Design a protein with these regions (language model features):
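Non-transmembrane functional regions of envelope-associated proteins
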Residues: 2-233
Length: 233
């Protein structure tokens, strides 16, 4: 009796099985992939190097004790940008959304004062002080500053975030294959108009809730937007 020639068939079976697991990706395969990836990061994490031209400005306890509670007024943030610009920063990137007017701006403080005669002089005096948001906008206009906005799954009535740079597409349209959102929490218009870059802060967690990847591009109403990382580069 002639034996079946398994030698040429086994590689094909292995190929079909591997392809099927990759396409279907059962839960156990996904979990295994995540564990292997995480173990790689623990065994050999990327070493810090002073040669990497990126610095993180961390708001720590010492900073809070010196300057005050967070969030800081926008006039203080303007001083931070100006100082970083003096130190030669190629770009200043904010991983936060300046979506609301500064609550410590003179005009905001003016609204908090009681409307009584004894406070009228203080109310008039606050009108003479420059607005914090305007000071910040003027400062970022003279530096390469990138701000962030947040994509949301809920449609909003406000204008879409500004796109600061165009995109060149080659071949099929990329938009259908990118993460899609219905709305966005954007930066104040007077600040957004002055910054050099504007990118999305969104990241998508894996099924286990861990963030391992950040999309470089995403869409809002079929328009392509860069992530904060892509815009900074």
């Amino acid at each position: 009796m002639r034996k079946f020639p398994w030698s040429p068939v086994l590689p094909l079976l292995f190929l079909f099985l591997s392809t099927g697991l990759h396409v279907i990706e059962p839960t156990f395969v996904e979990q295994l992939r995540h564990r292997v990836f995480d173990e790689y990061q623990r065994l050999k994490p990327r070493e810090y190097s002073n040669d990497i031209p990126v610095r993180i400005l961390d708001i720590d306890d010492e900073s809070l004790s010196r300057v005050g509670q967070w969030p800081w007024p926008r006039d203080v943030m303007a001083e931070v940008v100006a100082r970083l610009n003096e130190l030669g920063a190629s770009a200043v990137v904010f991983d936060m959304v300046f979506s609301q007017p500064d609550r410590l701006s003179p005009k905001s403080l003016r609204k908090m004062l009681p409307k009584r005669p004894e406070f009228e002089a203080a109310r008039e005096g606050l009108l003479q002080i420059p607005d914090n948001d305007e000071l910040f906008a003027q400062t970022v206009d003279g530096a390469y500053v990138v701000t962030g906005f947040a994509m949301t799954g809920r449609e909003t009535t406000e204008a879409a975030p500004a796109i600061k740079a165009g995109f060149a597409e080659n071949g099929d349209r990329a938009a259908p294959y990118l993460p899609a959102y219905a709305g966005a929490m954007k930066v104040l218009s007077n600040i957004e108009n002055k910054v050099a870059g504007n990118g999305a802060l969104n990241a998508i967690p894996e099924s286990d809730g861990v963030y391992r990847r950040i999309p470089m591009f995403m869409t809002l109403k079929d328009k392509i937007y860069p992530s904060l990382v892509a815009e900074s580069l």
